[in-house]
Amino acid sequence: MNIVNGGAHANNGLRIQEFMIRPDKAKTFSEAMNICFLIIQNLKKLIKDKNFSTAVGDEGGFAPMINKNEDALNLIIKSIIKSGYVNGRDVSICLDVAANELHKNGNYSICLLYTSDAADD
């Protein structure tokens, strides 16, 4: 499920287009939806606690004004843990990096995943 938008889907500093979660622990569709709902509610609270907007991007995920992909990933990991699940076992994080957006001058560049400030870190 798509939970954070960046790239072409949002007007923020994230270069990754979609941050998603996959509820691996779920045995039924209903259980999967409940897991995702709980994580999304906790993510929303974490975003609000950082004084970011909880507005959504083009694909329905939150689109907070975050500049670093790592910061978005950390928020998602914290929301998974806060929801009582283990990241990587109960719930997996999936990414749509939109590789076509990383293509420049005939080559793919991982540096395009980061803002110029983040690339300097």
Regions found by a protein language model. Name each.
Residues A8-A55:
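Mobile "lid/hinge" segments at catalytic clefts and subdomain interfaces of large enzymes
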